């Protein structure tokens, strides 16, 4: 009777060992992978695209900011003056271009023809006078200087006649295509300067680029600012991302889209929910700021986890425990 008892006890022991091992394995599986990370710090330095004197700031540190909200303004006066000058430049260029397209009026052509006749008469007189002076110089009646003066007057009258003839020819044939093209280019340049002046004036108003919380107010009204200098620093509140790191052994468990549970010290019994949004393709050494029981020399891959039910209690930079378990996969 002892032998069957021993066999029974042995079988019972084996079953107990198997059951215990199964329970231990399943509990380990339910525990799943645990990682440690932080809520990403995401900030935007807000600045004017143009420089000038800061006229006003409408927000203070800690304020809740909405996208499109007016945050502050520069002194508009210099940019309003530049806009007026640009508008005048467009008007002048437009008038010149229209004049080039329209050509010359009949009255202008008639005036140019009269100028040619007058210049022709003056040239004829100067030429005849020069001819007479040549005869007198040959007979030694006048000096060489008198003859040179007559020749100079003749040449000047000839140049005046040539200029009047060219002007009349231009009036009759209209403006050259090159001149019209140049006038059109000048008009387009003036319009571009006007558009830039309008944009510069618009950029004297500082607009919030996104929703968030104001972290820093770096300057005060009255300050002279250069273009691009930081005026305000905005902390972006949505979406909330968690940055965590995983080693190569567990990399296969971190597929994008997988559901995750996120625990904080402030609410250990009420996890946040998230999804893996990005897995870095490049390995790096574990950053010193990350809490991890593993060796710092391990190569790890960065994860971005998108929190789907974030609230105001989840602050940027806050440490977070990331759980990959059965519950997270099925919630």
Curated annotation (Swiss-Prot):
InterPro entries from the UniProt entry: CusB_D23 (IPR032317), UPF0194_membrane_YbhG (IPR022936), UPF0194_transport (IPR050465)
UniProt keywords, alphabetically: Coiled coil, Periplasm, Signal
GO cellular component, one term: periplasmic space
Signal peptide segment: 1-19
Top-rank taxon: Bacteria
Gene3D superfamilies, per the entry: 2.40.30.170, 2.40.50.100, Helix hairpin bin
Keyword Ubl conjugation: no
Parts forming coiled coils: 107-208
Protein's cellular compartments: Periplasm
The keyword Coiled coil appears for this protein: yes
One Pfam family cited in the UniProt record for this chain: HlyD_D23
Family affiliation: Belongs to the UPF0194 family.
Protein name: UPF0194 membrane protein YbhG
Organism: Salmonella gallinarum (strain 287/91 / NCTC 13346)
